[in-house]
């Protein structure tokens, strides 16, 4: 098995290779065709292809000379004003190589930049707009100051649909000569929650354990419990079997080593999916408020077991009240 990270090995190199995001790809291809584009802001959840789209755009614009015409920076590592005033300015001052009349600056995780750094970036964008275009990549567009947003065409990336994600994972598995069954794909999807990068990393980690990737192998690679075990705890609470629910909770906390926050996330997901029990809207809303309050108390430093046991007790009461209805 290759030691290369699969997320890099199978990263699309051109816009034609990008899975999903059809409307975005269509508009980006127009920029390539016209060799002209505004500043861009790519926003959306992690693992939805924002960085991949930016690099593919650079490949398609500049061909073999894309590296000479593209500056990549990660704002999480280089957040200060000094970077904006030195590296970007020095790079933006030089002319592009080739027949495209501008160079690219790709600034990943731009929503992690300080307010002062964003103001400095805004001035730099204005000063060098004649021969430089900026692609800002952010999980949250709302964290980018309005003066920058107004200077950019905003593209909002959506998580890859489940079917497309499965197709991509099966294709990668085929390229690597491994097998992956449907249960494994479901487990990977459950863990990644639409983040394709995380899904591919999980598949690679599982393949290091076995060339035949199953659900069991995936959870072994993750070092996580199956959602089924959390679901059983919730079902016990909803049925009023609190001692049984407590035993299952302790198993998750002390045998599997899950944190209270991890378990809360599982519970939140299960309540929303309603796989454990069907709930009317009012009951669902009440349970979600309880989950949120418990999460807050745990994050603030309260005892995990006490808070989670209190939540399970409240789940039992809410379920009983709903049944009487």
Curated annotation (Swiss-Prot):
GO molecular function: ATP binding; ATP hydrolysis activity; DNA binding; DNA clamp loader activity
Any GO CC annotation of this UniProt entry: DNA replication factor C complex
Gene3D superfamilies: 1.10.8.60, 1.20.272.10, P-loop containing nucleotide triphosphate hydrolases
Pfam families: AAA, RCF1-5-like_lid, Rep_fac_C
Any GO BP annotation: DNA-templated DNA replication
Record keywords, A-Z: ATP-binding, DNA replication, Nucleotide-binding
Entry-linked SMART domains: AAA
UniProt-annotated binding residues for ATP: 44-51
PANTHER family: REPLICATION FACTOR C / DNA POLYMERASE III GAMMA-TAU SUBUNIT (PTHR11669), REPLICATION FACTOR C SUBUNIT 4 (PTHR11669:SF20)
Family named by the database record: Belongs to the activator 1 small subunits family. RfcS subfamily.
Biological role stated in the UniProt entry: Part of the RFC clamp loader complex which loads the PCNA sliding clamp onto DNA.
Quaternary assembly: Heteromultimer composed of small subunits (RfcS) and large subunits (RfcL).
Protein's name according to its UniProt entry: Replication factor C small subunit
Protein encoded by which gene: rfcS
């Amino acid at each position: 098995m290759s030691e290369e990270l699969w997320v890099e090995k199978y990263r699309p190199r051109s816009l034609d290779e990008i899975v999903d995001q059809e409307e975005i790809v269509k508009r980006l291809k127009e920029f390539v065709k016209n060799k002209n584009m505004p500043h861009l802001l790519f926003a959306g959840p992690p693992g939805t292809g924002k960085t991949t789209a930016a690099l593919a755009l650079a490949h398609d614009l500049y061909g073999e000379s894309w590296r000479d015409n593209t500056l990549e920076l990660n704002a999480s590592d280089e957040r200060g004003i000094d970077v904006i005033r030195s590296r970007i300015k020095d790079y933006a001052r030089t002319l592009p190589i080739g027949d495209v009349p501008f160079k690219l600056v790709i600034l990943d995780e731009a929503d992690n930049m300080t307010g002062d750094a964003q103001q400095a970036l805004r001035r730099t964008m204005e000063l060098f707009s004649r021969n430089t275009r900026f692609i800002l990549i952010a999980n949250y567009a709302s964290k980018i100051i309005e003066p920058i947003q107004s200077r950019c065409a905003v593209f909002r990336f959506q998580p890859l649909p489940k079917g497309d994600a499965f197709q991509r994972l099966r294709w990668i598995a085929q390229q690597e000569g491994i097998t992956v069954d449907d249960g494994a794909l479901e487990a990977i999807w459950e863990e990644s929650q639409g983040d394709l990068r995380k899904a591919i990393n999980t598949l690679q980690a599982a393949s290091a354990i076995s060339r035949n990737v199953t659900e069991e192998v995936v959870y072994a690679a993750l070092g996580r419990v199956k959602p089924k075990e959390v679901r059983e705890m919730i079902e016990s609470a909803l049925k009023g079997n609190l001692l049984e629910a407590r035993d299952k909770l302790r198993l998750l906390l002390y045998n599997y080593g899950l944190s209270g926050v991890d378990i809360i996330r599982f519970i939140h997901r299960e309540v929303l999916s309603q796989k454990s029990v069907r709930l009317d809207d009012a009951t669902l809303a009440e349970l979600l408020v309880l989950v949120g309050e418990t999460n807050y108390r745990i994050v603030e430093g309260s005892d995990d077991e006490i808070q989670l046991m209190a939540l399970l007790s409240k789940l039992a009461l809410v379920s009983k009240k709903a049944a009487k209805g």
